[in-house]
Amino acid sequence: WTDKVNVDFSTGDTNIDNYLKWICFQPVLRRIYGCSFLPYHDYGKGGRGWRDLWQDCLALLIMEPSVVRQMIVDNYGGVRMDGTNATIIGSRQGEFIADRNNITRVWMDHAFWPFVTTKLYLDQTGDLDILLEKVTYFKDLQTKRGTAHDNNWDHAYGNKQRTAGGNIYFGTILEHILLQNLCAFYDVGEHNEMRLHGADWNDALDMAWEKGESVAFTCAYAGNLKDIADCLKHMEEKTGISKIEMAEEMKCLLAEGTELYESPDRKQKLLDEYTSLCEHNVKGGMILVSTEQIRKNLVEKAEWLMQHIREKEWISAGDDMGWFNGYYDNHGNAVEYSKKDEVRMMLTGQVFAVMSKTAGEEQVKEICRSADKFLFDQKAGGYRLNTDFKEEKFDLGRMFGFAYGEKENGAVFSHMTVMYANALYQRGFIREGHKVLQTLLEAAMNFENSKMYPGLPEYFDNEGRGLYAYLTGAASWYMLTMITEVFGVKGDLGDLVIAPSLLPEQFDEKGSAGLKLEFARKKFEIIMHNPCLLYTSPSPRDSTSS
């Protein structure tokens, strides 16, 4: 186990350094015990979920990068041609099982995570060739993004998408990525935000199938579209590849123009036309599209989404505070607001608005002030997932059946809290990001209160007790944030970049802080020296501090 956890931090506080070892170990334990037979798991029968596949890879990219390439390739085999994915994961790598439910549940965030992991892999390794690896698509009874059945499918057909000629269809990983994110772009509700379907990252937002919308993940997908466009640009520059092969059915997904973007009805119609084309078999024909055309198309779509959200979803609360509405409920009403006698605010929408750069710099400042006022609770371990709605809001989700401060209803949910920190660091809000990470760490390390194994729990309750030790992906994100943002050691298409965001208190008495890790199959010990500690508090714009 000591060999397995090959990351070491030196921050001047040995208690924190040792505890970070346990957090780095936790993703290994999560793969073994998360969603398992143990009473700590929360739910499940021992299998892994779709998000687990991709978030486990995040930690492995740091600790065991050699095994990750094939995992990523195999995981893309769970994607359907309609942009959704298998939800029952087999015991073998790359094995996906048909869901026998009448209408399978669709989590609208699922298509977001694969590219997040793939992008980190590309940055860590520079292996752009993986994007051109050909992979199958998953096929079962479910079609049209969980709203219909393919009555021509049976078990004899198998669980791999076929062509009209009966052959198994293979598409590049890049095609899978484009398909996932473009289908999401068109799958919108009446407010032109992406439909919530059966839930997003918050599994307990599960009662707004008809009219629910997730502004939070509309932000997230907008960020993905821009990052995919950047990826295409780098691929053309480094490999000379200027044209991409894709299924001929996908041509309609590259439609463009403001008139289309501003019409939810036209978007839904286009998506229906596309999903009808691949409802049973695909033709098997391919088209060639220039990378420049696709890149411009993605950027145009991303910028439209971001501007739409800035114009329609921003809530001004006065006193230099404000945040984005993150959701619409099943009656089509905005979930978050600021009224004279009541405030409703949720963390998830702010995380992805900040991370995707949908939020401008002044808006990030206002979000930080609002989160500190309405969501921060030191006793409970940090930033709550939402304010107290004081109602059983079952036109949005089961989360409102939990007591406030339990599980998804306003608990300090470690995973989203760490992602909030990560987003703040990415935007240069170092002191604010540090507060998020440090408060969470202190809550976990206070064993009299947290009453848990070393690591990060799924969430902390009102009293600061940590619950469900191995379910969460928070440990992977905490380790990733410490390495790539706090210490600033990260890859850039295979090149090593060091741009630390350490605060004075994170150096030892000699003015040093250090990190041991593997990169590009080599072992590094990186020491950052700041003997003068030249300043005491970085401005929000600072990206380095040593």
Predicted feature residues:
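Acidic/His metal-coordination segments adjacent to aromatic residues that form catalytic metal sites
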Residues: Y33-S36, T87-R105, H197-E210, H331-V335, ...
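Active-site acid/base region of carbohydrate-active enzymes
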Residues: K4-W22, Q70, N75-T84, K119-E213, ...
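Surface beta-strand/loop "capping" patches
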Residues: L493-I526
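Active-site core of glycosidic bond-cleaving carbohydrate-active enzymes
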Residues: G49-V67, Y76-G78, I168-L179, A208-D227, ...
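Catalytic cores of secreted or luminal carbohydrate-active enzymes
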Residues: G464-Q506
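Single conserved hydrophobic/aromatic residue that forms the stacking wall/gate
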Residues: Y535-S545
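Aromatic-rich carbohydrate-recognition surfaces in CAZymes
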Residues: L60-E64, V68, I72-E190, V215-L225, ...
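An acidic-aromatic substrate-binding cleft motif
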Residues: W1-Y43
